[in-house]
């Protein structure tokens, strides 16, 4: 991890298109300004983690639905054979 020190109104660049600027410092809280291309999603870490968890749960649900569908098809085939 790269660790940098910056003061108010100073910034860092990530690549050619992303600028992160220190807007204000108030005690232990720092306000950042992020200038990035619109096609790049920018999230707070806790929001990003929540989105990832929801995606994992959705994938599990899709897998569960596929298993349930197979179960019902097998059951229907058995009834049709009788």
Swiss-Prot record:
**Which family does the record assign?**
Belongs to the CsrA/RsmA family.
Stored HAMAP family: CsrA (MF_00167)
Q: Which Gene3D superfamilies does the record match to this protein?
A: Translational regulator CsrA (2.60.40.4380)
Describe the protein's quaternary organization and the partners it interacts with.
Homodimer; the beta-strands of each monomer intercalate to form a hydrophobic core, while the alpha-helices form wings that extend away from the core.
For biological process, the GO terms are: bacterial-type flagellum organization; mRNA catabolic process; negative regulation of translational initiation; regulation of bacterial-type flagellum assembly; regulation of carbohydrate metabolic process
Cell compartment(s), UniProt: Cytoplasm
NCBIfam families referenced in this protein's UniProt entry, alphabetically: csrA, PRK01712.1
Q: Where are the transmembrane segments?
A: none
Q: Which organism is it from?
A: Brevibacillus brevis (strain 47 / JCM 6285 / NBRC 100599)
Protein name, please? Translational regulator CsrA
Traced from the root, the source organism's taxonomic lineage reads: Bacteria, Bacillati, Bacillota, Bacilli, Bacillales
């Amino acid at each position: 991890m790269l660790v940098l020190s910056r003061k108010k109104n100073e910034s860092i660049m990530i690549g050619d298109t992303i600028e992160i600027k220190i807007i204000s410092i108030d005690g232990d809280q720092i306000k950042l300004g992020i200038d990035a291309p619109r096609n790049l999603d920018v999230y707070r870490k806790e929001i990003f983690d929540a989105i990832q968890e929801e995606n994992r749960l959705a994938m599990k649900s899709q897998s569960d639905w596929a298993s349930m569908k197979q179960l019902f098809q097998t059951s229907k085939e058995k009834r049709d054979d009788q």
